[in-house]
Amino acid sequence: MKKKKIGLLVMAYGTPDSLDEVEAYYTHIRHGRKPSEEALQDLIGRYKAIGGISPLAKITKEQAHKLTDSMNNMFTEYEFNCYLGLKHTAPFIEDAVEEMKRDGIEQAISIVLAPHYSTFSIKAYNERAIRLSEEIGGPVIKPIDQWYDEPKFISYWADQIKETFTKIEDKEKAVVIFSAHSLPEKIIAAGDPYVEQLQHTADLIAAAANIQNYTIGWQSAGNTPDPWIGPDVQDLTRDLFEEYRYESFIYCPVGFVAEHLEVLYDNDYECKVVTDELNAAYFRPNMPNAQSTFIDCLATIVSRKMKEIVDKELILNNN
Protein backbone atom coordinates (compact mmCIF):
# COMPACT_ATOMS: atom_id res chain seq x y z
CA MET A 1 0.00 0.00 0.00
CA LYS A 2 1.33 3.41 -0.96
CA LYS A 3 2.20 5.60 2.00
CA LYS A 4 0.32 8.87 2.43
CA LYS A 5 2.64 11.87 2.26
CA ILE A 6 2.65 14.47 5.01
CA GLY A 7 4.50 17.75 4.61
CA LEU A 8 6.62 18.79 7.58
CA LEU A 9 7.08 22.54 7.31
CA VAL A 10 9.93 23.60 9.60
CA MET A 11 10.19 27.37 9.90
CA ALA A 12 12.95 29.52 11.34
CA TYR A 13 14.38 33.04 11.20
CA GLY A 14 17.13 32.42 8.69
CA THR A 15 20.66 33.77 8.46
CA PRO A 16 23.04 34.80 5.66
CA ASP A 17 25.26 32.04 4.29
CA SER A 18 28.17 34.42 3.72
CA LEU A 19 29.25 37.96 4.53
CA ASP A 20 28.31 38.96 0.97
CA GLU A 21 24.67 38.16 1.80
CA VAL A 22 24.49 40.25 4.98
CA GLU A 23 23.25 43.41 3.26
CA ALA A 24 20.38 41.63 1.49
CA TYR A 25 19.48 39.86 4.73
CA TYR A 26 19.52 43.10 6.73
CA THR A 27 17.49 44.86 4.03
CA HIS A 28 14.83 42.14 4.18
CA ILE A 29 14.60 42.49 7.96
CA ARG A 30 14.08 46.24 7.42
CA HIS A 31 11.17 45.58 5.02
CA GLY A 32 13.14 46.55 1.92
CA ARG A 33 14.92 49.59 3.36
CA LYS A 34 18.69 49.36 3.01
CA PRO A 35 20.66 49.85 6.23
CA SER A 36 23.11 52.70 6.60
CA GLU A 37 26.73 51.84 5.85
CA GLU A 38 27.54 52.26 9.54
CA ALA A 39 24.80 49.83 10.61
CA LEU A 40 25.81 47.35 7.91
CA GLN A 41 29.46 47.38 8.92
CA ASP A 42 28.49 46.98 12.57
CA LEU A 43 26.53 43.82 11.74
CA ILE A 44 29.30 42.47 9.50
CA GLY A 45 31.74 43.14 12.34
CA ARG A 46 29.64 41.04 14.69
CA TYR A 47 29.65 38.14 12.24
CA LYS A 48 33.42 38.45 11.87
CA ALA A 49 33.76 38.39 15.66
CA ILE A 50 32.11 34.94 15.84
CA GLY A 51 34.26 33.49 13.07
CA GLY A 52 32.91 35.01 9.88
CA ILE A 53 29.39 33.63 9.63
CA SER A 54 26.71 32.11 11.84
CA PRO A 55 26.40 28.31 12.14
CA LEU A 56 22.61 28.74 12.26
CA ALA A 57 21.92 27.81 8.62
CA LYS A 58 23.69 24.47 8.96
CA ILE A 59 22.13 23.71 12.34
CA THR A 60 18.60 24.58 11.19
CA LYS A 61 18.88 22.24 8.20
CA GLU A 62 20.20 19.48 10.42
CA GLN A 63 17.36 19.99 12.92
CA ALA A 64 14.74 19.86 10.15
CA HIS A 65 16.09 16.73 8.49
CA LYS A 66 16.70 14.84 11.72
CA LEU A 67 13.19 15.70 12.87
CA THR A 68 11.77 14.40 9.59
CA ASP A 69 13.74 11.16 9.94
CA SER A 70 12.44 10.77 13.47
CA MET A 71 8.83 11.27 12.35
CA ASN A 72 9.24 8.68 9.59
CA ASN A 73 10.53 6.21 12.16
CA MET A 74 7.59 6.89 14.47
CA PHE A 75 4.81 6.81 11.86
CA THR A 76 5.86 4.09 9.43
CA GLU A 77 2.53 4.07 7.58
CA TYR A 78 3.11 7.67 6.47
CA GLU A 79 5.88 9.39 4.55
CA PHE A 80 7.01 12.72 5.98
CA ASN A 81 8.64 15.11 3.54
CA CYS A 82 10.77 17.93 4.91
CA TYR A 83 10.25 21.53 3.78
CA LEU A 84 12.35 24.33 5.26
CA GLY A 85 10.83 27.81 5.23
CA LEU A 86 12.76 30.83 6.48
CA LYS A 87 11.57 34.31 7.43
CA HIS A 88 14.38 36.45 6.06
CA THR A 89 16.48 34.29 3.71
CA ALA A 90 15.89 31.69 1.02
CA PRO A 91 14.21 29.29 1.00
CA PHE A 92 11.49 31.64 2.21
CA ILE A 93 8.31 30.38 3.89
CA GLU A 94 6.40 30.98 0.66
CA ASP A 95 8.97 28.95 -1.30
CA ALA A 96 8.36 25.98 0.97
CA VAL A 97 4.57 26.20 0.67
CA GLU A 98 4.77 26.40 -3.13
CA GLU A 99 7.12 23.40 -3.18
CA MET A 100 4.67 21.37 -1.10
CA LYS A 101 1.90 22.24 -3.54
CA ARG A 102 4.05 21.17 -6.52
CA ASP A 103 4.88 17.90 -4.77
CA GLY A 104 1.21 17.09 -4.34
CA ILE A 105 1.23 17.42 -0.56
CA GLU A 106 -2.35 17.69 0.69
CA GLN A 107 -1.72 17.85 4.43
CA ALA A 108 1.14 19.42 6.35
CA ILE A 109 2.21 20.17 9.89
CA SER A 110 4.11 23.36 10.62
CA ILE A 111 6.48 23.96 13.51
CA VAL A 112 8.50 27.09 14.21
CA LEU A 113 11.91 26.61 15.81
CA ALA A 114 11.02 28.97 18.65
CA PRO A 115 9.23 27.77 21.79
CA HIS A 116 7.33 30.90 22.84
CA TYR A 117 4.25 32.24 21.07
CA SER A 118 4.27 35.82 19.88
CA THR A 119 2.40 37.78 17.26
CA PHE A 120 5.85 38.82 15.98
CA SER A 121 7.19 35.30 15.65
CA ILE A 122 5.13 32.11 15.63
CA LYS A 123 1.85 33.76 14.66
CA ALA A 124 3.52 35.69 11.83
CA TYR A 125 5.30 32.59 10.49
CA ASN A 126 2.17 30.47 10.46
CA GLU A 127 0.02 33.23 8.98
CA ARG A 128 2.43 33.63 6.06
CA ALA A 129 2.34 29.91 5.36
CA ILE A 130 -1.41 29.44 5.75
CA ARG A 131 -2.29 32.58 3.79
CA LEU A 132 -0.40 31.37 0.73
CA SER A 133 -1.61 27.77 1.04
CA GLU A 134 -5.20 29.03 0.98
CA GLU A 135 -4.48 31.25 -2.02
CA ILE A 136 -3.00 28.43 -4.10
CA GLY A 137 -5.40 25.71 -2.97
CA GLY A 138 -3.35 23.68 -0.55
CA PRO A 139 -1.90 22.02 1.29
CA VAL A 140 -3.97 22.18 4.48
CA ILE A 141 -1.49 23.23 7.16
CA LYS A 142 -1.96 22.24 10.80
CA PRO A 143 0.15 24.71 12.82
CA ILE A 144 1.86 24.15 16.15
CA ASP A 145 1.50 27.43 18.04
CA GLN A 146 3.77 27.00 21.04
CA TRP A 147 5.80 24.47 23.01
CA TYR A 148 7.40 26.55 25.77
CA ASP A 149 6.25 24.11 28.49
CA GLU A 150 7.01 20.83 26.69
CA PRO A 151 8.40 18.52 29.44
CA LYS A 152 11.31 17.29 27.29
CA PHE A 153 12.28 20.90 26.51
CA ILE A 154 12.21 21.72 30.21
CA SER A 155 14.24 18.60 31.02
CA TYR A 156 16.87 19.47 28.43
CA TRP A 157 17.60 22.83 30.02
CA ALA A 158 17.32 21.52 33.58
CA ASP A 159 19.96 18.89 32.80
CA GLN A 160 22.22 21.50 31.23
CA ILE A 161 21.94 23.72 34.29
CA LYS A 162 22.66 20.84 36.67
CA GLU A 163 25.77 20.03 34.64
CA THR A 164 26.87 23.67 34.75
CA PHE A 165 26.45 23.84 38.53
CA THR A 166 28.96 20.98 38.93
CA LYS A 167 31.60 23.49 37.78
CA ILE A 168 30.65 26.09 40.42
CA GLU A 169 32.00 25.91 43.98
CA ASP A 170 29.81 28.47 45.76
CA LYS A 171 26.37 27.66 44.39
CA GLU A 172 24.67 30.18 46.68
CA LYS A 173 26.59 32.92 44.87
CA ALA A 174 25.40 31.82 41.42
CA VAL A 175 22.38 33.07 39.48
CA VAL A 176 20.68 31.81 36.32
CA ILE A 177 19.41 34.33 33.78
CA PHE A 178 16.81 32.90 31.41
CA SER A 179 16.47 35.02 28.30
CA ALA A 180 14.70 35.39 24.98
CA HIS A 181 14.84 37.85 22.11
CA SER A 182 13.37 41.18 23.14
CA LEU A 183 10.36 42.48 21.22
CA PRO A 184 8.66 45.90 21.12
CA GLU A 185 6.84 46.69 24.37
CA LYS A 186 3.61 47.36 22.50
CA ILE A 187 2.96 43.60 22.25
CA ILE A 188 2.36 43.50 26.01
CA ALA A 189 -0.41 46.10 25.81
CA ALA A 190 -1.94 44.05 23.00
CA GLY A 191 -2.18 41.00 25.28
CA ASP A 192 0.67 39.00 23.75
CA PRO A 193 1.58 36.04 26.05
CA TYR A 194 5.29 36.14 25.13
CA VAL A 195 6.57 37.57 28.44
CA GLU A 196 4.37 35.31 30.57
CA GLN A 197 5.48 32.26 28.62
CA LEU A 198 9.17 33.01 29.15
CA GLN A 199 8.54 33.40 32.88
CA HIS A 200 6.62 30.10 32.91
CA THR A 201 9.47 28.35 31.09
CA ALA A 202 11.96 29.75 33.61
CA ASP A 203 9.83 28.67 36.57
CA LEU A 204 9.47 25.12 35.22
CA ILE A 205 13.19 24.74 34.48
CA ALA A 206 14.19 26.21 37.84
CA ALA A 207 11.89 23.77 39.65
CA ALA A 208 13.23 20.82 37.64
CA ALA A 209 16.84 21.86 38.26
CA ASN A 210 16.13 22.71 41.91
CA ILE A 211 17.56 26.22 41.75
CA GLN A 212 16.39 29.25 43.72
CA ASN A 213 18.48 32.08 42.32
CA TYR A 214 17.10 32.88 38.89
CA THR A 215 15.36 35.58 36.88
CA ILE A 216 14.39 36.42 33.32
CA GLY A 217 15.96 38.99 31.02
CA TRP A 218 15.83 40.10 27.43
CA GLN A 219 18.46 40.39 24.75
CA SER A 220 19.24 41.46 21.20
CA ALA A 221 16.70 44.32 21.11
CA GLY A 222 16.26 46.06 17.78
CA ASN A 223 17.53 49.56 17.11
CA THR A 224 14.20 51.33 16.60
CA PRO A 225 12.50 54.38 18.15
CA ASP A 226 9.93 52.16 19.90
CA PRO A 227 10.76 50.92 23.42
CA TRP A 228 11.62 47.22 23.67
CA ILE A 229 10.97 44.76 26.49
CA GLY A 230 13.56 44.87 29.27
CA PRO A 231 15.62 44.55 31.31
CA ASP A 232 18.44 43.87 28.88
CA VAL A 233 20.63 40.99 30.05
CA GLN A 234 23.73 43.17 30.30
CA ASP A 235 22.01 45.79 32.46
CA LEU A 236 20.41 43.00 34.47
CA THR A 237 23.81 41.42 35.12
CA ARG A 238 25.14 44.66 36.60
CA ASP A 239 22.00 45.19 38.71
CA LEU A 240 22.11 41.65 40.10
CA PHE A 241 25.78 42.01 40.94
CA GLU A 242 25.22 45.32 42.72
CA GLU A 243 22.30 43.97 44.75
CA TYR A 244 23.38 40.40 45.52
CA ARG A 245 27.12 40.25 44.74
CA TYR A 246 26.75 37.10 42.69
CA GLU A 247 30.06 35.55 41.67
CA SER A 248 28.79 33.30 38.86
CA PHE A 249 26.29 34.12 36.12
CA ILE A 250 24.67 31.34 34.08
CA TYR A 251 23.03 32.54 30.88
CA CYS A 252 20.31 30.31 29.42
CA PRO A 253 18.93 31.83 26.20
CA VAL A 254 15.91 29.51 26.21
CA GLY A 255 14.09 31.57 23.60
CA PHE A 256 16.56 30.23 21.03
CA VAL A 257 17.22 26.64 19.98
CA ALA A 258 20.62 26.91 18.28
CA GLU A 259 23.95 28.66 18.38
CA HIS A 260 23.79 31.78 16.26
CA LEU A 261 24.76 35.45 16.31
CA GLU A 262 22.51 36.40 19.23
CA VAL A 263 24.02 33.67 21.40
CA LEU A 264 27.63 33.62 20.20
CA TYR A 265 27.97 37.42 20.20
CA ASP A 266 25.28 38.92 22.43
CA ASN A 267 25.82 36.31 25.15
CA ASP A 268 29.30 34.86 24.72
CA TYR A 269 30.93 38.20 23.93
CA GLU A 270 28.81 41.08 25.24
CA CYS A 271 27.61 39.43 28.45
CA LYS A 272 31.07 38.04 29.13
CA VAL A 273 32.52 41.54 28.80
CA VAL A 274 30.22 42.56 31.65
CA THR A 275 31.04 39.57 33.88
CA ASP A 276 34.75 40.18 33.27
CA GLU A 277 34.29 43.81 34.34
CA LEU A 278 32.63 42.58 37.53
CA ASN A 279 35.30 39.90 38.08
CA ALA A 280 32.53 37.29 38.00
CA ALA A 281 32.42 33.93 36.22
CA TYR A 282 30.52 33.52 32.94
CA PHE A 283 28.71 30.30 32.04
CA ARG A 284 26.45 29.49 29.11
CA PRO A 285 25.15 25.90 28.84
CA ASN A 286 25.10 24.10 25.50
CA MET A 287 22.33 25.07 23.11
CA PRO A 288 19.95 22.32 21.92
CA ASN A 289 21.18 22.48 18.29
CA ALA A 290 20.59 19.07 16.68
CA GLN A 291 21.29 16.98 19.76
CA SER A 292 19.29 13.77 19.84
CA THR A 293 17.51 14.74 23.07
CA PHE A 294 16.22 17.93 21.46
CA ILE A 295 15.20 16.21 18.22
CA ASP A 296 13.25 13.75 20.36
CA CYS A 297 11.59 16.72 22.06
CA LEU A 298 10.54 18.22 18.72
CA ALA A 299 9.32 14.83 17.48
CA THR A 300 7.12 14.47 20.56
CA ILE A 301 5.57 17.88 19.86
CA VAL A 302 4.95 17.12 16.18
CA SER A 303 3.62 13.65 17.02
CA ARG A 304 0.84 15.19 19.08
CA LYS A 305 -0.32 17.20 16.09
CA MET A 306 0.07 14.18 13.82
CA LYS A 307 -2.16 12.10 16.08
CA GLU A 308 -4.90 14.70 15.58
CA ILE A 309 -4.67 14.07 11.83
CA VAL A 310 -4.64 10.28 12.27
CA ASP A 311 -7.62 10.36 14.65
CA LYS A 312 -9.59 12.54 12.24
CA GLU A 313 -8.86 10.12 9.38
CA LEU A 314 -10.05 7.19 11.50
CA ILE A 315 -13.32 8.98 12.26
CA LEU A 316 -13.88 9.79 8.58
CA ASN A 317 -13.06 6.23 7.51
CA ASN A 318 -15.47 4.77 10.06
CA ASN A 319 -18.39 6.97 8.96
Swiss-Prot record:
Record Pfam families: Ferrochelatase (PF00762)
Subcellular location: Cytoplasm
A GO-annotated cellular component: cytoplasm
Single GO term (MF): metal ion binding
Key words, A-Z: Cytoplasm, Heme biosynthesis, Iron, Lyase, Metal-binding, Porphyrin biosynthesis
Membrane-spanning segments: none
Binding site for Fe(2+): 181, 262
Cited InterPro entries: Ferrochelatase, Ferrochelatase_AS, Ferrochelatase_C, Ferrochelatase_N
Enzyme Commission designation: 4.99.1.9
Residues that hold Fe-coproporphyrin III according to the record: 13, 30, 46-47, 54, 125
Recorded superkingdom: Bacteria
CDD domains: Ferrochelatase_C (cd00419), Ferrochelatase_N (cd03411)
Catalytic activity annotation: Fe-coproporphyrin III + 2 H(+) = coproporphyrin III + Fe(2+)
BP GO annotations: heme biosynthetic process
SUPFAM superfamilies linked to this entry: Chelatase
Pathway given in the UniProt record: Porphyrin-containing compound metabolism; protoheme biosynthesis
HAMAP family: Ferrochelatase
Family statement: Belongs to the ferrochelatase family.
Functional description taken from the UniProt entry: Involved in coproporphyrin-dependent heme b biosynthesis. Catalyzes the insertion of ferrous iron into coproporphyrin III to form Fe-coproporphyrin III.
Identification of the protein by name: Coproporphyrin III ferrochelatase 2
Gene name in the database record: cpfC2
